[in-house]
Amino acid sequence: MDTHQSFNENQHPNFNSGNHGGINMNRFQRFSKPTISPIQQQQQPQPQQPSSIIQRQSIIMTQPQPQPQPQMIPIFREPNEWYKLIDMEMNKFNNESRPSPEYIKYLTQLFQQALDSLEHKNTPEFYLFLLNRATFQSKIGENEDAKGTLKYMKVLKMESFEVFVLLSEIESKSFRFSKARSIINRGIQKIPSRSKEFEGFLMVIDIQEDEFSRNGCIISNNNNISFNNGDVNNNSIIMNENDQPMVINLNPQQQQQQQQQPYEISSSSSLMSTPASSRHLSNRSSIVPTPNSSTKLSESIKTIGLRSVQPRRVIHKQTTTNFNTTTTTIPENSYDDDADQPMDHDGNNNNNFRIHSNNNNNSSANSSYNKSENDEDDQDEEDEEEEDEDEDDDEEDEEEYEDNNNNNNNNNNNNNNNNNNNNNNNNNNYFKYNRQQYILNNDSDTSTNPNSPASSNSSVNDIINSISITDDSKLDYENNVKLQQQQQQQQQQQQQQQQQQQQQQQQQYIQQQQQQQPKIHPQRFSLQNNTPTTTTTTTAATNVQNPSSSSSYISPPLSSQSSELQHQRRHSIQAQRANKPPVIPPPSKLHQNNLQQQQQQQQQQQQQQQQQQQQQLLLQQQALLQQQQQQQILLQQQQQQQQQQQQQQQQQKQQEQQLKKTNMQPPPPKQPQPQTQTQQQQKNINNSEIVDKEKSFEVAKSWSEVAMVNGKPYLRIEFIGKGGSGKVYKVLSGDLKIYALKYVCLSDPNEIEAQLNEIEMLKRLRKQVNIIQLIDYEVNMAKNYILLVLEFGEIDLSKLLQRLQTPNGTNVNFIRIYWQQMLQAVHTIHEEKIIHGDLKPANFVSVQGSLKLIDFGIAKAIQSDDTTNIVRESQIGTINYISPEALIDTSQGGPKQCMKLGRASDIWSLGCILYEMAFGYPPFKSFSNIISKYQAIINPHHKIEFPVHPNENLLKVLKLCLIRNPHERPTIPTLLNHDFLKI
């Protein structure tokens, strides 16, 4: 009986283990694991397997006939119980260094049971469950199953930062670095907020790929090691390479040889300098021996599905030559910092290396050395750098020493000294003392060089002992150095005295030569070291006169002396070099010309940069001037329009007053005057223009839709916008004028009432300049629509503010002009005893440069007490600009809300619009939740924040308009006379 079928019959009817939410979960797993209850698990016999066999959880054991599994009683838990249990077990699993195979099997079954019982939905809890399952599968080596779980998370739209990182880590374990990198790049596209962390993982992938290309494996990644299920005493290790295990078995002879002898490695191996390699070497004792003693090391390496690259577990190298055999060996405990250092047969410390050399009976002794570098010891690297610098100084000192000997004509001593130095260099090969002791076992006699006096008095071992300095003799060495410094100072004083004597003798000799020969060729003297080299008699004379000085200063050290004399010579030469003044050669003409050319080029570059900067500044200034001119032109135009509007209003008032005085008597009709020829010509021109317009309009009908309003055609040009149940189009009339056509569908009774109310208000305000003009309208109740032909506005105030908004805020001059026009428009409707009730930036449109008020759907007439009652089933107006009193219900429990509003309610809305013009956002924009925003508006204790603004008068106007008490708010005339509008 199939395990999944038996489990599906007994599980809860709401869940389906094979098909979760229409998705087959089994296709995301490489194989399905049987579900076994804990009781049946104890009853099943556990097969005994040898400890040398290494098993992995991910290997599928193919059998000819699958064994039938006993039917399991499903365990039903609440989802929270499953999540808590999985979380607890994963914490326990992460804390264990070597989880047992039984515990791994238990966790596998636990995850399977939870997966079958939980509902597969995109929830945070189920996301954590699947992420824990993928992490667990990756840690136990089930990389394919982990990838299947992560792919299933992608199907459930659970793409997160952790999913991409875990997928890329699995691919990098399998050395598919390009795929891992593509996964991280996909994660950067999906989750750009975590791009910095993704870039860090890209760097890790590059490092791993570099290690893999150099070493054949990832040394720094220690997560690729898992332990065998067998006996712990065997200490068998499996290293996952290309998602495949590798088993290394050694026979007993090889294991015994490894325990007795240190492991042999190549001195050029890069593993010696890395801390990670030391951990691999320390685990080499855990390689499992096999009972077969006749097999070799190469035969004992059994790879299971390995690719071209194999992990470097043991590096064995032995070089043989015709003359000598050299093997570098490392003790097992040489990489442990706390372990004691092994002792050689003489009782000396060996730090990390021993050198065993077997020399044949040849004519010359060939010494080989090895240099070890430890990255963990920074002091060793500094010592080596200092030694390299000392070697360079030695070479320079030897050259200077040879020059001094040549100047003093001590060629014989100089040749002996060079021979001694060459012999010493050939023998010791610059052995370094770097906190390590080198022991050279010389088993054969060395041949001597008859030309060198050192070969008869000292051997190779004496030279090494004279050069190498151990850790125990460092204090003695420092004391000797101090004594040498004192001796050097004394020698320097003696040398200075000798030089003074030589200079005096030279001056005397030069005076004698000048007396004998008044004309001397300039080439007979050389200025090297201030000593004449014209004849050999002078140097001979000085040598005869000062035999002690020449012997004490020029005599080279014999080869039988120790290295202390070499150190003395080195310090004396360094002291002489320090006392010499630096020789600065005069600059050549070519060098001077080059310097002049460079200076000229630099000056030219600086001049070009200055010119470019000046041009940029000029361009910026010109752009600013153009902007200022445009602003001034706009201001002048708006001021002219305002003056014209004021004049028209004054004329209307005067006409009304005259009508009142004349008791509403109409003026007498004008008598028709005879038409002149010019008037007739104008009429003819107008008639011809009308004919042309009609023709063009008829042509335009062929390519555009036509809307009929009261029998008049209007061509639809483009769609402007929509709001509620209405749509607005840009149309062209028969006389070729642009208008706005508003189409409203009468599906809601409230909408019908609002549109009819707007028509009445616009008809009432038809003669007002600051109000949008109603051109024509049609109400068709049979077809449930209303058509309104309105004056066309180019742009509303909301979009205009977005264009004018800058990082420094909107220009105060623009705010002042638009604020004045808004006040005049609202003052017009207040004079007609109308309250708008829904003032916002979108309800002010710009018509040929001037702002006009639109949307009178909820406007109401004011009653006798300067207020009006607005009854609605829901709130009215836009909440960002609505006044507190418009949100307070005064119906006292009635079926509909009743708000009592006045002119002060529109003042509050104007203040909110001015706040947005000044700071870029309305006063209650910070509250994202509509309920919290509602409570903040009606709360009298909530203080509105007023940011800092350079114009103090603007802040004063804002604070006056946003007073919570409507009786304390200013009126429109007060705001028009405020200092803010005075330029």
Swiss-Prot record:
First-level EC class: transferase
Ranges that cross the membrane: none
Substrates-to-products reaction catalysed: L-seryl-[protein] + ATP = O-phospho-L-seryl-[protein] + ADP + H(+); L-threonyl-[protein] + ATP = O-phospho-L-threonyl-[protein] + ADP + H(+)
CC terms in the record's Gene Ontology section: centrosome; kinetochore; nucleus
Acidic residues: compositionally biased ranges: 374-403
Coiled-coil stretches noted in the UniProt entry, renumbered to this chain: 380-430, 474-517, 588-665
Region (Disordered): 1-26, 252-430, 441-460, 513-601, 654-691
Biased composition (Polar residues): 1-18, 279-301
E.C. designation(s): 2.7.11.1
Record: active site: 838 (proton acceptor)
Binding site residues for ATP: 720-728, 742
Biased composition (Low complexity): 253-278, 319-329, 348-371, 404-429, 529-563, 673-683
BP-aspect Gene Ontology terms: chromosome segregation; meiotic spindle assembly checkpoint signaling; mitotic spindle assembly checkpoint signaling; protein localization to kinetochore
Keywords: ATP-binding, Coiled coil, Kinase, Nucleotide-binding, Serine/threonine-protein kinase, Transferase
InterPro entries: Kinase-like_dom_sf, Mps1_cat, Prot_kinase_dom, Protein_kinase_ATP_BS
Keyword Transferase: yes
GO MF assignments: ATP binding; protein serine kinase activity; protein serine/threonine kinase activity; protein serine/threonine/tyrosine kinase activity
Residues annotated as domain Protein kinase: 714-981
Keyword Oxidoreductase among UniProt keywords: no
Superkingdom, natural source: Eukaryota
Family: Belongs to the protein kinase superfamily. Ser/Thr protein kinase family.
Protein name: Probable serine/threonine-protein kinase mps1
